[in-house]
């Protein structure tokens, strides 16, 4: 019997902050399971979840507005510790008898908080000291409204010059509120505060570790599918690869992986996937060469969205055909991860994340009545990678840069042709190889090459050439919501350009994309 790694858990109620998923990831990093729900939960749902503690997230709304989100009153009656962050502190203060007002000045950025009163939340935690020996904390503020009066049974723990109630606490009820964001790295002691709340105040054990997650997932897969056969679409990406390894550990040869080679992959990627998962790890893989079929379907199409839909449709068709060839397959496995689940969650109030339908594979034929196996659906991407390492997958594969689902189909601008894909594959491989050699690959968040459907005059030896143009793209970002173009060294860019033009016959010019996001997107299409 495996250990119950969900025994101690934190419930995070989401009021819409851009940092809310980061709060959840920080709690998981502390070895404690947590779930992220929309703020408008019911008492029955909270009782059923049985949390060891509750965190109220930040949010963009104003608590001074009549219809702004509020925590369910039961949150404060459940008898568990509650931690309000930014908006979460404001709604806690207002709902428990305090007062919140709009501020003429929005406080955004670095601030120093002076600790005035002892509290379990910050005891022994400091960045520096005042002249008279009081602890100071370096924190990150992001708020417009502020608490102007705390509930009568709370005490002021810390303040700033412009924020008199930066931390408030009711130690008896174990209610805490902070006006800053402990989850961001700019709040230097933020992880220690979260650890203090989760591990000490809520008394959660660190049960959520990669090894225990694997044991739990394997046990649950075996319980769910028994001796039945399972099919998985393996792309070679992180999510499907880790899903494949978990299933292989759980059910061995009862797993069949279908690898659809669509002709839109990186250089030698198909061979690498087959070598790694088939030859090295011994998985049962069906390799489906489908380049011609995909390129035929894409012929003549220039619109990026139409290309995405064509690639998705043809993939589903090919996968379905292969699935129908297999006998007695009763389960479809997908690499759905926790952010997909969060995005798919609908809220009656419309305050939750944008709702979208999530399908890794798409629809299966109606005649195939299959159950769904999603062993990663509780995990964030960083957790999936850690589990992949624990399962023996190579670091370079798990931590390589993001690659779009439609592959080179959206990195070849305009119509997709085999000639263009072949040129792009080789140029991109040179760029990535040089980034690794220069120890720059892990210093940028994403790097790739784009094929431009324009010809440019060049000179090669004594002759002129009229060949294609590619653009190099490299960005630095924390969350991929915004990004800066990477300031790569000129000599490095020159070396990459020379290699591509000299080694890839058919390319005469290399340019570098210096657009940020916004206004540009990271991918060109």
Curated annotation (Swiss-Prot):
Domain of life, source organism: Bacteria
Keyword list, A-Z: ATP-binding, Glutamine amidotransferase, GMP biosynthesis, Ligase, Nucleotide-binding, Purine biosynthesis
Gene Ontology BP annotations: GMP biosynthetic process
UniProt-listed Enzyme Commission number(s): 6.3.5.2
Pfam families (alphabetical): GATase, GMP_synt_C, NAD_synthase
InterPro entries to which the protein is assigned, alphabetical: Class_I_gatase-like, GATASE, GMP_synth_C, GMP_synth_GATase, GMP_synthase, GMPS_ATP_PPase_dom, NAD/GMP_synthase, Rossmann-like_a/b/a_fold
Active-site residue list: 86 (nucleophile), 181, 183
Region forming the signal peptide: none
Residues annotated as domain Glutamine amidotransferase type-1: 9-207
Top EC category: ligase
Catalytic activity: XMP + L-glutamine + ATP + H2O = GMP + L-glutamate + AMP + diphosphate + 2 H(+)
Pathway membership, UniProt: Purine metabolism; GMP biosynthesis; GMP from XMP (L-Gln route): step 1/1
Residues annotated as binding ATP: 235-241
PROSITE patterns in the record: GATASE_TYPE_1 (PS51273), GMPS_ATP_PPASE (PS51553)
GO cellular component: cytosol
Domain called GMPS ATP-PPase: residue spans: 208-400
Example GO molecular function: ATP binding
NCBIfam families according to UniProt: guaA_Cterm, guaA_Nterm, PRK00074.1
Subunit structure: Homodimer.
Function: Catalyzes the synthesis of GMP from XMP.
Annotated protein name in UniProt: GMP synthase [glutamine-hydrolyzing]
Organism encoding this protein: Salmonella typhimurium (strain LT2 / SGSC1412 / ATCC 700720)
Taxonomic path: Bacteria, Pseudomonadati, Pseudomonadota, Gammaproteobacteria, Enterobacterales
Name of the coding gene: guaA
């Amino acid at each position: 019997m495996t250990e119950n790694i969900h025994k101690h858990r934190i419930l995070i109620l989401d009021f819409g902050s851009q940092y809310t998923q980061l709060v959840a990831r920080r709690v998981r990093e502390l070895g404690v399971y947590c779930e992220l729900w929309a703020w408008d939960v019911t008492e029955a749902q909270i009782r059923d979840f049985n949390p060891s503690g509750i965190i109220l997230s930040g949010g963009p709304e104003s608590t001074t507005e009549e219809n702004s989100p509020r925590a369910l009153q039961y949150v404060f009656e459940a008898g568990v510790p509650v931690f309000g962050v930014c908006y979460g502190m404001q709604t806690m203060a207002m709902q428990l008898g305090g007062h919140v007002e709009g501020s003429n000045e929005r406080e955004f950025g670095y601030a120093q908080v002076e600790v005035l009163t002892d509290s379990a939340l910050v005891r022994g935690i400091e960045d520096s000291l005042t002249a008279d020996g009081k602890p100071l904390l370096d924190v990150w503020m992001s708020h417009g409204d502020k608490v102007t009066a705390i509930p009568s049974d709370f005490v002021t723990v810390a303040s700033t010059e412009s924020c008199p109630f930066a931390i408030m606490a009711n130690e008896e009820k174990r209610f805490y509120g902070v006006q800053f964001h402990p989850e961001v790295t700019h709040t230097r002691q933020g992880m220690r505060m979260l650890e203090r709340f989760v591990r000490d105040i809520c008394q959660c054990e660190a049960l959520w570790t990669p090894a225990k997650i694997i044991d739990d997932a394997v046990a649950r897969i075996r319980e769910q599918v028994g001796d039945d056969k399972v099919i998985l679409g393996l792309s070679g990406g992180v999510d499907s690869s880790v899903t494949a390894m978990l299933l292989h550990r759980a059910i061995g040869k009862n797993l069949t992986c279908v690898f659809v080679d669509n002709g839109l992959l990186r250089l030698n990627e198909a061979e690498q996937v087959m070598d790694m998962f088939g030859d090295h790890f011994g998985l049962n893989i069906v390799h489906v060469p489908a380049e011609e079929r995909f390129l035929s379907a894409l012929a003549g199409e220039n619109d990026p969205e139409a290309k995405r839909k064509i690639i998705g449709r043809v993939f589903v068709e090919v996968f379905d055909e292969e699935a129908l060839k297999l006998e007695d397959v009763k389960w479809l496995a997908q690499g759905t991860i926790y952010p997909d689940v969060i995005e798919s969650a609908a809220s009656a109030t419309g305050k939750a994340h944008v709702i979208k339908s999530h399908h890794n594979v798409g629809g299966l034929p109606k005649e195939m009545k299959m159950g769904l196996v999603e062993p990663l659906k509780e995990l964030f991407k960083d957790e999936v990678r850690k589990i992949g390492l624990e399962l023996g997958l190579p670091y370079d594969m798990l931590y390589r840069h993001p690659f779009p689902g439609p592959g080179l189909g959206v990195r070849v601008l305009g119509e997709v042709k085999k000639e263009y894909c072949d040129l792009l594959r080789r140029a991109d491989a040179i760029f990535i190889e040089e980034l690794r050699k220069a120890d720059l690959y892990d210093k940028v968040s994403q790097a790739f090459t784009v094929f431009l459907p324009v010809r440019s005059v060049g000179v090669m030896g004594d002759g002129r050439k009229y060949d294609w143009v590619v653009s190099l793209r490299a960005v630095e970002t924390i969350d991929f919501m915004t990004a800066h173009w990477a300031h790569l060294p000129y000599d490095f860019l020159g070396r990459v350009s020379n290699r591509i033009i000299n080694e890839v016959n058919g390319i005469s010019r290399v340019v570098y994309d210096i657009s940020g996001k916004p206004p540009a997107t990271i991918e060109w299409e």
